[in-house]
């Protein structure tokens, strides 16, 4: 693995924009184009027992592995991964990884809330026992205290995953006041050496690119994985742009990404989606970040025709322990509160 690696998660995190309905041919083409652009890791979607194999929220690896197998014709270190949400894990749905063939899903990104750490440990062990690389994805890492981060590191050191992530679920982290540097330093100083550190950001404060560049330039021998999407595709303000971060790494002579192929992919397969489903910076999603609130609260208030000023006041009414996960009942109570 390179020291700095880009994980494109367009087909998974970008799917919140179009309900993961990219279409079979477009799924094939996007994976093919990303592979030929020399992306380090491609996230191919969610493994979901209630999913549909015509989308990138699929219920088995059969279809997606057949696509990967049809594409991978050249020598490459590119890896293919899928995400599983802890509460949707079904052991029968995850097959044993039967061979050392890299041209298939070989890594699982497991998301979990810190209240579910014991269940997470149990399922993480199952995933590792089935032969997959494990990517630990703690939802809203910003909400962890230093003690909780150190406890999580202890769990990771015992599990020996491939990657432990810093996940900025609500796009509220910055370099100083929410201390991305502090969290990274805790991980870097205490994780065993062969565990990579990942960073998954959301662009609500327009800081995804700057923060990613800061991490890339940290002096450490540890491998770092940066998540991004084509054209920043993602709900609300979107994500770090794959085309921008690949350009940055190429300019610094760290990456060897095919930038023309990347922008061709955007024009052919992502721009048409954006024409019908907009994403990107907006004041309401800036407010969700500045109030450290789940963006679905903002979506709910917008659906109820609230102004920007009203949204900010409503977000401030939500108790801190209710902000990190959307609760429709709480949102309605805020609106009805006089």
Give a label for each model feature.
Residues 1-338:
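Catalytic cores and adjacent flexible loops of soluble metabolic enzymes
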